[in-house]
């Protein structure tokens, strides 16, 4: 007598349900929409320094010393714009505020246990230009701290690396201000 046509998934429900692991960025859909609207409306709510930087980075033609045309990739632009929008426009300073404000399903809301310091991240693929986004964020913070005399912005920065390979790459990019001299940042 043949067995029933049960599959492994039927025998162990939930074992192959990967949806909990795919929900690592629950705020992204709402933020992506809001940031696009904010961009289309001319970056309202930012300092004059931030507006100058955004216009320079994304609305100015850049030529490298090699005479090659340079533009930031769309993922890099979206990452720094989102960071600026969340920090400067919406003034979100905790993961709790971020989750409560932008998560679409409040039933899945799990507030972090330790949330005393503002922490921001961008989730970007390998080779998509995370180091360039880091340099954009540093320039944005530094010049707002200096030009706007605003204590909400930093003048000193700590860059952490997950391993020696990444550390060596970051060191070669940032050592001696190389990335700030080679890229059109300011």
Q: How would you describe each model-predicted region?
A:
Residues 1-186:
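RecA-like P-loop NTPase motor core of helicase/translocase proteins
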């Amino acid at each position: 007598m043949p067995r029933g046509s049960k599959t492994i998934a039927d025998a162990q429900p939930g074992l192959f349900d990967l949806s909990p692991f795919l929900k690592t960025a629950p705020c992204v859909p709402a933020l992506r929409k809001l940031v696009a609207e904010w961009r289309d409306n001319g970056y309202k709510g930012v300092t004059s320094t931030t507006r100058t930087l955004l216009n320079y980075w994304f609305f100015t033609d850049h030529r490298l010393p090699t005479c090659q045309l340079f533009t930031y990739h769309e993922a890099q632009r979206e990452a720094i714009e989102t960071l600026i929008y969340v920090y400067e426009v919406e003034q979100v300073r905790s993961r709790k505020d971020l989750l409560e404000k932008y998560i679409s399903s409040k039933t899945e809301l799990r507030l972090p246990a330790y949330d005393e310091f503002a922490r921001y991240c961008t989730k970007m693929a390998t080779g998509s230009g995370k180091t360039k986004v880091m340099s954009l964020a540093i320039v944005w913070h530094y010049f707002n701290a200096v030009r706007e005399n605003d204590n909400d912005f930093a003048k000193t920065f700590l860059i952490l690396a997950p391993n020696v390979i990444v550390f060596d790459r970051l060191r070669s990019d940032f050592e001696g201000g190389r990335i700030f001299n080679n890229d059109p940042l300011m």
